């Protein structure tokens, strides 16, 4: 794996043009060597490159041209995530997350079919490693009941959402960061506080419905 990471580092040098003349084609080759050797960072780099190219193709000419690129991006993000790369796990959640577009268009754009259950599982994996963007998406899915396998788990989902939102707030109060990151953290913290209020409102609603049934 040491050789694989060396390929990744070499690819980074050529991709960014640091210390050597920039050569993105050569960088891609080195990243591929690294990915084949098991470097999660190299796989993530390839996923990022192909995702950016897919987006560029989708924005410019024909949507179908982006399909193989988006599929490649998803493949490499999955490879990296399975090797423990946390941002790639978050990216997989983002790719699977259902949107208000047809499934065929979703697959063309993101390289996978929409699947909220898969999205939730990947967000949960990254959230467990305290990756803040994943924590926000995971708790939002829990709150909205998206990707749930069984309605009987609703109370457990709300408990989990409360736990994750609370951890986001505590993290924001402890971590020192620059101005831009601080502003982003403040927005996430405010969203988390709003999420906690919504959780309490949902619990009160469930209690009220239970009471009304009991009185019938």
Positions of PLM-derived features:
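Short helix-capping/linker turns of helical repeat alpha-solenoids
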Residues: 1-3, 16-18, 37-39, 53, ...
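TPR/TPR-like (Sel1-like) alpha-helical repeat modules
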Residues: 155-175
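Short coil/turn and helix-start
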Residues: 18-22, 36, 55-68, 82, ...
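Hydrophobic face of amphipathic alpha-helices that form TPR/SEL1-like repeat modules
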Residues: 9-16, 45-57, 91-103, 135-146, ...
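Terminal, low-structured helical/coil segments at or just beyond the last alpha-helical repeat
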Residues: 170-216
């Amino acid at each position: 794996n040491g050789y694989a990471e060396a390929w990744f580092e070499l690819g980074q040098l050529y991709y960014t043009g640091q210390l050597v003349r920039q050569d993105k084609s050569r960088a891609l080759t080195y990243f591929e060597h690294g990915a084949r050797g098991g470097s999660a960072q190299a796989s993530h780099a390839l996923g990022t490159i192909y995702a950016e190219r897919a987006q560029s193709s989708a924005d410019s000419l024909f949507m179908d041209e982006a399909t193989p690129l988006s599929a490649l991006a998803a493949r490499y993000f999955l490879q990296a995530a399975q090797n423990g790369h946390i941002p790639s796990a978050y990216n997989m959640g983002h790719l699977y997350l259902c949107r208000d577009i047809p499934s065929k268009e979703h697959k063309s754009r993101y390289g996978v079919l929409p699947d909220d259950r898969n999205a939730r599982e990947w967000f949960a994996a990254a959230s467990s490693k305290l990756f803040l963007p994943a924590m926000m998406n995971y708790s939002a899915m829990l709150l909205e009941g998206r990707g749930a396998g069984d309605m009987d788990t609703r109370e457990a989902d709300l408990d989990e959402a409360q736990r994750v939102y609370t951890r986001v707030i505590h993290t924001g109060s402890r971590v020192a960061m620059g101005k831009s990151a601080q502003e982003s953290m403040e927005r996430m913290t405010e969203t988390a506080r709003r999420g906690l209020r919504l959780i309490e409102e949902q619990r009160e609603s469930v209690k009220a419905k239970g009471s009304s049934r009991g009185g019938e």
